[in-house]
A protein has these predicted regions:
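Amphipathic/coiled-coil alpha-helical interface segments used
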Residues: 186-187
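Short, structured beta-strand segments at or near domain termini in extracellular proteins/domains
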Residues: 191-204
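Residue-level detector of conserved catalytic or cofactor/ligand-binding positions
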Residues: 1
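Functional-site microenvironments in short loops/helix caps that host divalent-cation chemistry
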Residues: 4-182, 191-193
Length: 204
């Protein structure tokens, strides 16, 4: 079951890794095209958009014109109260800090609400974290050189890129990758209110 967000213009959330992959397989069958999750290399290439800075807009933390992350529009108290009302058990880290700016959203924003990067790609940092197709490895030493998905390492630990609307500026970085582990359920079956995915279509 996929959970739709606030409106049709918001990203779909509460999607597990397995569900995201199943959707791309269904879409491929329906259209005759090849759709899949991005690899880590593809994701970072599209997120950086030719830049070498920490984020595609530069090295400063404050990027409220470019990304929907944790900022002055939300306090820990209001966030946790809202999550409790939605039935979520999400817990904020003790050192949770927010960017010193306002992006206008407490939670997810409609797709395309912020300035895109130099490639014209929207919402690569913040809004919702995105599943990618690789197996987890803390380093990139064993990553394929051709941009394909890494198939060695811990393949039961799926990877999230881009961070989300409640993540601190520290995590809204083009290089940040997170190998997800759940204490409640099988990793690839786990859903959260800030987990989504981006689809790639192969062009022959």
């Amino acid at each position: 079951m996929l959970f739709r967000s606030i409106t049709d213009k918001h990203p779909v959330v509460c999607v597990s890794w397995n569900e995201a992959v199943a959707y791309t397989e269904w879409l491929s069958e329906e259209t005759g095209e090849t759709y899949r999750l991005l690899t880590e290399s593809e994701w970072e290439y599209s997120a950086r958009a030719g830049t070498k800075t920490i984020r595609f807009w530069g090295d400063i933390d404050e990027g409220c014109d470019f990304a929907n992350g944790a900022d002055l529009d939300i306090t820990p108290e209001s966030f946790l109260e809202e999550m409790k009302g939605r039935g979520s058990k999400i817990v904020l880290p003790e050192d949770w800090v927010v960017a010193d700016c306002h992006d206008g959203y407490k939670f997810s924003a409609p797709v395309g609400s912020f300035i895109p990067n130099n490639f014209g790609v929207y919402d690569v940092l913040g809004n919702v974290a995105e599943w990618v197709g690789d197996c987890w490895d803390s380093s990139y030493e064993n990553s394929p050189r051709d941009g394909s998905a890494r198939v060695s390492g811990n393949c039961n630990r799926p990877i999230l890129r881009g961070a989300s609307y409640y993540d601190m500026p520290l995590y809204l970085r083009s290089s940040n990758h997170y190998g997800f582990e759940s204490k409640q359920s099988e990793n690839k079956e786990t859903r959260y209110i800030n987990f989504g995915f981006r689809v790639l279509r192969e062009i022959n």
